[in-house]
């Protein structure tokens, strides 16, 4: 004879109040997969504790459960046509459980990395284990749950081997069935909070098969040869390769017009004016003197040519006056290397230039072009070589002697003026004849 199902009595009003209170204290589910198992397990526990056979009370309890779920989740799962907790639970698990396959979660649990901190390592491993077990509990597949629990238990040994050597040797002989037992054992031995500063985790890139590997894109992947950046120019390009030009400062007295002009080496010592028009050069500087090489006075060699036309004022004293002003003559007959004649007044009586003046102007002319050809000695301050305190000179005594000398000179001049000449001796002067005139 079959047994009739037991009739579940309805709940009292006080029990209904307690059910509403406990469901209201459950954390509201907002769609987080990590909190789904906690929410579902709490609701299952409350419904198992306050079971009722009254349909009216069941609808009231179901209304409290719906209010503990966010409206967005309810719209997503379409819970408007659901009237029991089993239907709602099935849709929540189907839509919000971890979608990662179980075997992938198990592999992530086994490969939990150890980064030196024992506690952080075990907490991360426990979090990954709970993710897998929570999914197995939500799916309610007994066979699959039993299978994966055995694999989790066998994976504890791989986690223990990742611990430092001194910790592994102390816990190797203990029976550790699960991860919670390992945590409790390390807490008892005082090794749960240890931090290993020498990490056993070895980075793979330090032991790469290609130590010469470069992360630059300009690398030949076949033979691992570095290719340096080169200009994009084909071998059969009609455009020839042009070397960069060397620039120098043009010789001009105006500091506002010191733009670079191209300089080409001149090995034959021939005057070659620049053929390139400089758009930045003003028109009045087209005929300016360019001291690249000398055309006249070729008998004097050039020893150290200053190609930058720079004059070191600190080394050679004062800078000489430049004599390369533009001539007022016709540009066709203008010779830039000719010395400029110094003008003289008309009544000077000198119509030409002396040889010394000509050579002096030549020296001044070449000095502006090649300042290192001729060396001259600047005026030194002799106080550096003869200090003032080396000879103690009495200035007062020296002045007194000088004054006495001047007074003596004045006294001698006065005596000479007062002395009268001997007129008598001058009037009676007779020349004396020689005794022997034949001599």
UniProtKB/Swiss-Prot annotation:
Annotated organism of origin: Drosophila melanogaster
Biased composition range(s): Low complexity: 313-333
Region annotated Disordered, chain positions: 203-224, 243-353, 412-439
Subcellular localization(s) per the UniProt record: Virion
Superkingdom assignment: Eukaryota
The name this protein goes by in its record: Retrovirus-related Gag polyprotein from copia-like transposable element 17.6
Chief localisation class: virion
Compositionally biased spans, kind Polar residues: 245-255, 266-312
Keywords of the record: Transposable element, Virion
